A protein has these predicted regions:
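Catalytic-domain carbohydrate-binding cleft regions of carbohydrate-active enzymes
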Residues: 1-207, 214
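Accessory, solvent-exposed terminal regions and/or long lumenal/extracellular loops of proteins
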Residues: 208-296
Length: 296
């Protein structure tokens, strides 16, 4: 911070209460095992509930050799984790995406690209975390504490309050039993509705991670980029799902501390029923606005 005024990026695996003020955290030297993939979800949710929201696991596992199937499923968890990082030890099979077969590479690319498209949603959640302490990756019990079905639910999680992710965590499975809490939920891609307070068996072939959006939910996305900074983020696309809802979107330059001096924008989106668009109100204008805001 003293040298170039840009926000620092620090990563550690040894931490204590309060570390979240200084560093992101990863969960240590895991192994390329399905059991360790299953552990990743409660580990990251527990860290978030303990105040350490910016955390992740070694995608694919650090020790031993990762299989193509395990890598595909781990990437589907990592893409929604606050810290998304593939990492492995010397002596294990190389885990770069291109070291795998073409099918695995295609699936890996799909979820990395989805991550890039979801950056404005994730950024909003980090902003919310800074203001309130709410984690980015959340156990369902955080928002549905009166629903006993969520008390010991470790196979799915929320990203913010609007997006529910239910990854496959068992070897060889191509279907997923998903619990949806109260309300109506919509498939992220197809917008097919599901009534809550019940379990569903949904298809989940190797290239699919079940995702659901809460009724009235809105998910901001950017146009696909291959890396941050490849193109200007001047167009915001807002995915709208049926139901009444509001959404606060935050925008700044993503690089320095100018936001502390007011160099940021806040947009309040309001949506009702089955409308295809939402109204937009500028709550705060201190930065370059988007050229386009699109709805889908």
């Amino acid at each position: 911070k003293e040298n170039d005024k840009r926000r620092p990026f620090v990563i550690t695996r040894a931490c204590y209460a309060g570390t979240q003020k200084y560093s992101t955290v990863w969960t240590g030297d895991n192994q390329s095992l399905w059991a360790h993939l299953r552990m990743a979800v409660p580990q990251l949710c527990n860290l978030g509930m303990s105040g350490i929201a910016f955390a992740g696991t070694d995608v694919g596992g650090f020790g031993a050799d990762c299989t193509p199937e395990l890598m595909c499923r781990w990437v589907q968890v990592g893409a929604f984790s606050p810290l998304f990082r593939n990492h492995s030890s010397v002596g294990s099979t190389y885990q770069e995406p291109w070291q795998f077969d073409e099918k695995t590479l295609r699936i890996y690319r799909k979820f990395v690209e989805l991550r890039y498209q979801l950056l404005p949603y994730l950024y909003d959640l980090f902003h919310e975390c800074e203001l309130t302490g709410l984690p980015v990756m959340r156990p369902l019990v955080l928002h549905y504490e009166n629903d006993p079905e969520t008390w010991n639910l470790n196979g799915e999680f929320l990203v913010g309050e609007n997006l529910l992710v239910a990854p496959v965590l068992e070897q060889g499975e191509t279907k997923k039993i998903v619990y949806l809490p109260e309300g109506t939920w919509y498939d992220y891609e197809t917008k097919k509705p599901y009534q809550g307070k019940q379990y569903y068996m949904v298809d989940a072939p190797l290239d699919t991670c079940p995702m659901f959006v809460k009724e009235g939910g809105m998910i901001p996305t950017y146009e696909l980029a291959q890396y941050v900074g490849e193109k200007p983020y001047d167009t915001l696309k807002m995915r709208i799902y049926p139901g009444d809802g509001t959404y606060l979107h935050y925008q700044d330059n993503g690089e320095d501390f100018a936001y502390r001096d007011g160099a940021y924008n806040e947009y309040m989106f309001t949506h009702k029923g089955n409308e295809k668009e939402a109204s937009v109100q500028m709550n705060k204008e201190g930065y370059t606005k988007y050229k386009n805001i699109l709805f889908e």
